[in-house]
């Protein structure tokens, strides 16, 4: 029984967990976004919120770069994400299945369904090393914005995000 408890504790310790952080912005996020030349605002959680304009058909897309990081052993990553669907109603099953099928075709990132209070969201997320350089961060920002916008257009026909 002691071995089972010890194994359970070790397994729990190995699961990815958020790094301890307060609600201030991460200096690494600030530095890399400024180095790239992006303008952004910092939300209440300390995350960087960007509006990516100039997408197809004059569209734009919101995306966030998390200030908090995830730790798995020695590996530290952060999420870059965008919402393509936000509604009081859950995403219909056939559209959720479509997102799951799309996941297999992406080089980076995946779709997940989340609930924020009473609202349901389809969120595209890419995890990058927390200390990723500007070239990598810029590539991921563009991938997140373009993917989020294309799927928002496909799911809703709108440009709300």
Where are these regions (language model features)?
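Sec/Tat-exported extracytoplasmic proteins
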Residues: 36-40, 54, 103, 148-155
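Short, internal acidic amphipathic alpha-helical interface segments
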Residues: 30, 35-36, 77-120
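Long, continuous compositionally biased terminal/linker segments
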Residues: 55-83
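A mature extracytoplasmic/lumenal domain signature
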Residues: 44-46, 54, 67-69, 84, ...
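Soluble non-cytosolic domains of exported or imported proteins
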Residues: 23-27, 90-93, 131-138
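Short, highly charged C-terminal tails/helix-capping segments
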Residues: 156-161
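A short, solvent-exposed beta-edge/loop patch
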Residues: 105-152
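Charge-rich, low-complexity N-terminal segments
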Residues: 2-6, 12-60
């Amino acid at each position: 029984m002691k071995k089972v408890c010890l194994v359970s504790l070790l397994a729990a310790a190995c699961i990815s967990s958020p790094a301890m952080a307060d609600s201030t912005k991460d200096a690494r996020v600030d530095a890399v976004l400024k180095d790239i030349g992006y303008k952004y605002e910092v939300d209440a959680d300390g995350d960087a919120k960007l509006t990516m304009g100039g997408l197809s058909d004059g569209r734009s897309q919101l995306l966030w770069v998390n200030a908090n990081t995830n730790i798995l052993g020695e590996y530290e990553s952060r999420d870059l994400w965008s919402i393509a669907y936000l509604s009081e109603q859950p995403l219909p099953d056939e559209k959720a299945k479509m997102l799951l099928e799309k996941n297999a075709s992406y080089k980076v990132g995946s779709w997940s369904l989340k609930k924020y209070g009473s609202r349901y969201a389809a969120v595209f997320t890419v995890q990058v090393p927390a200390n990723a350089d500007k070239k990598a961060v810029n590539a991921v920002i563009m991938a997140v914005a373009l993917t989020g916008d294309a799927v928002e257009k496909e799911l809703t026909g709108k440009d709300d995000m």
